Amino acid sequence: SSDLSTGAVDAIMDDQPVIEYAIKQGQDLSINMEGEAVGSFAFGVKKGSKYEHLVTEFNEALAQMKKDGSLEQIIQKWTASTTTATPTTTTAAGQKATPVKSKYIIASDSSFAPFVFQNSSNQYTGIDMDLIKAIAKDQGFEIEITNPGFDAAISAVQAGQADGIIAGMSVTDARKETFDF
């Protein structure tokens, strides 16, 4: 958006929550058109890994957060919008998980505000961070967040160096071949 403010470009296109967050931060931007549906963002694990249960647990907790309004609170905290997404679940929402290990390593990308970014106190924060922390608490497991960058986060999960990824990752057919969402 710096190119826009200096006049180097006349318009920019980005994900709606990214622009809404920039507006909320005081940037002189506006949204002047209807957006295009480009898919959805998701939490993922390596297909065939022993941590595929994390997707089910994530979705169960997400459904409960949708039901109790806490998902809406997180989204509104970081953007000006609300969500109408309906997570799918395979078991009852709110059912506690039985962790397979004491701590799960979740890889992310800290350069994608408002989803994940470093604040002025050098703390990782944003929609994805609030979401994964709330889900870990709801499901009764510990997490360790790493922020190696988007491509490195994908590689870390594929190599088994991280158990899952939450990094504003869009769900595509190609990614479905490698990841479960």
What are these regions (language model features)?
Residues L4-S5, F43, F58, I135, ...:
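Hydrophobic residues within well-ordered alpha-helices
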Residues T83-Y124, K137:
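Immediate post-signal peptide segment of exported/extracytoplasmic ligand-binding proteins
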Residues D10-A11, S30, A42, I105, ...:
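Short, Asp-centered acidic motifs that coordinate Mg2+ and/or phosphate
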Residues Y124-A134:
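Short catalytic helix/loop segments, enriched in acidic residues and glycine
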Residues D28-A37, G48, M129, K137, ...:
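Acidic, polar ligand-binding/catalytic clefts
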